[in-house]
């Protein structure tokens, strides 16, 4: 079983700790309107968990909590997951199943490589995504629909502006993943969990190398 990077508990904690060991200037880059839209979404999620304010604070305390003392990408992903109330990860679930089945798990990138990629995400892309927080619910619904339909091209088009869809995150990493996958797949009885943005590039490299690649949908 191949995964993009290490997914064990210790590695996940190191990523979280690293994300908490930085700063950002997101509050100064975002308009007050954008900040309050995010604050409203965060408060709505908190209200659903029974944390309703009798008299709501006049300052964006949730936004401040999520953006204080963390790296830009850590702030974004924390806000994104909280606003959408989406704690799931297909990669992590695949890893857990593989461990339970006692399968050999291979990380295609080191933790250090993955952290470097996260730090390289342009802040401008993060700001742009946060500016569009009002449309996140619609984005999530469209994403799920396209995913369930197996519409890869539709997903690529929908998510082209997402923070991790730039050339820094894709591109070179596709080649790296292909090089790790190839000998493992040649040996047989293998599966790889990768983010869908990598699928076009990786499958292209496999086809160029003479492999037959077929999309299978339920």
In which residue ranges do the predicted regions lie?
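Structured, acidic catalytic/metal-binding patches in enzyme active sites
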Residues: 1-165
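A cross-kingdom marker for long, charged
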Residues: 163-218
């Amino acid at each position: 079983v191949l995964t993009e990077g290490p997914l064990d508990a210790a590695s996940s904690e190191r990523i979280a700790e690293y994300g908490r060991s930085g700063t950002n200037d997101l509050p100064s880059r975002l308009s007050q309107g954008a900040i309050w839209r995010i604050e409203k979404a965060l408060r709505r999620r908190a209200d659903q968990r029974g944390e309703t304010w009798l008299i709501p604070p006049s300052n964006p305390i949730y936004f401040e909590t999520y953006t204080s003392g963390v790296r830009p990408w850590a702030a974004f992903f924390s806000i994104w997951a909280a606003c959408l109330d989406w704690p799931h990860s297909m990669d992590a679930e695949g890893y857990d199943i593989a461990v339970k089945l006692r399968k050999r798990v291979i990380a295609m990138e080191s933790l250090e490589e993955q952290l470097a990629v996260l730090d390289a995400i342009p802040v401008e892309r993060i700001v742009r995504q946060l500016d569009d927080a009002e449309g996140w619910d619609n984005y999530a619904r469209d994403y799920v629909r396209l995913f369930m339909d197996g519409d890869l091209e539709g997903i690529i088009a929908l998510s082209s502006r997402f923070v991790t869809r730039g050339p820094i995150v894709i591109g070179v990493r596709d080649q790296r993943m292909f090089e790790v996958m190839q000998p493992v797949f040649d040996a047989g009885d293998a599966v790889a969990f990768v983010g869908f943005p990598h699928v076009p590039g990786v499958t292209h490299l496999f086809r160029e190398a003479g492999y037959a690649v077929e999309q299978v949908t339920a």
